[in-house]
Amino acid sequence: MKVALLGTGFGQAHAAVYAARGDVDVVVFGRTQAKLEQLRDTFGFVTTTDLDGIYADPSFDLIDICLPTALHAEHALRALAGGKHVLCELPLALNMTDAQRVADASADSDRQVFVDMAGRFSPAYLLLRDAVDDRTYGQLQVLELELRSALLWPGYDLRSDTIVLDMLHGELDTLVRLLGMPETTTTATVTGTQQGSAVQAIFTYPDAIARVSGSALMPVPYGVQGGYRATFTDGVLEHTFTADFTGQAPHAVVHEHTARGHREVTAAGSDSFTAAIDHVLACLQGEDINQLTPASVLDSLKLTLDVHHAVNRRAGTSAATAR
């Protein structure tokens, strides 16, 4: 299978997964020669600055889009029009109109489109999903999802205009898949004095409440940390994970708390990034059914955009007040 990987930023994470497989032929597109050389030296992939040449080449099976967010929908549609399968990094689009266009084009095509909602394949998420579906601990009453990170990528910031879309979309997808769309949403935000920001969002449901929080105000040695706490009528599942300041060396654990006591629960499986790309390639080989369709992410994208707009209205009001 031949893959065109578009983008040298987050595309590096995808490149590492492809390189570990050894059964795909990857060509990386980028505009910065130094970054392309780094990817070529690290993974041995062919690189190019000729984007039109990629789209004109009928030998590519899959276009993997890791370009800036504003370009995602445009390139997904272009790839489909060229008869190629698509893997698109989050978010699918910056508005629901463009997202629906991709979903409609995907439904009308014999090519497959995958939105890289990798968290759906996280072993800890799958364990939680099964607990909710099977009512292992009764009814889910409170769901708390957290993600905290240092700014680990040179030149990249997570201010109020990007943090929800770039950092919390996956957490909000988890929320929607477990509890559905909320009745009400309340947000709060703070912006770092130089870089970063933090967001808290509270959601209400008829019989549950939820909180999603993200912070990009952490010092570099903090790395990335987060997880969930799910409180049921008859128990609690608590998941924590950490990764070092390179974003690597992840460690994750899930604990169960019930009236019988406390124990660590095994959440088996690959890391979510690897599992998601493995799923994409399995689908293209006819071995699995697409769980990452554009239609499947529309509700979570709508909620993400709603929170994004609420946070930025609040941030704008705070800035005006400060002046």
Question: Where are these predicted regions, by residue range?
Answer:
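N-terminal Rossmann-like dinucleotide-binding module
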Residues: 1-43
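C-terminal helix-rich "cap/oligomerization" subdomain common to oxidoreductases
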Residues: 5, 62-65, 111-112, 278-323
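Beta-loop-alpha module in the N-terminal Rossmann-like domain of NAD(P)-dependent dehydrogenases
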Residues: 14, 43-103
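Active-site loop of classical SDR/Rossmann-like NAD(P)-dependent oxidoreductases
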Residues: 31-34, 264-278
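A contiguous active-site-proximal alpha/beta segment in oxidoreductase catalytic domains
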Residues: 93-152
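Mid-domain beta-loop-alpha active-site segment that forms a flexible
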Residues: 116-123, 151-184, 196-197, 296-297
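Contiguous beta-strand/loop segments that form the cofactor/metal-binding neighborhood of enzyme cores
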Residues: 172-245, 276-282, 322-323
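Short polybasic amphipathic segments
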Residues: 228-230, 245-260
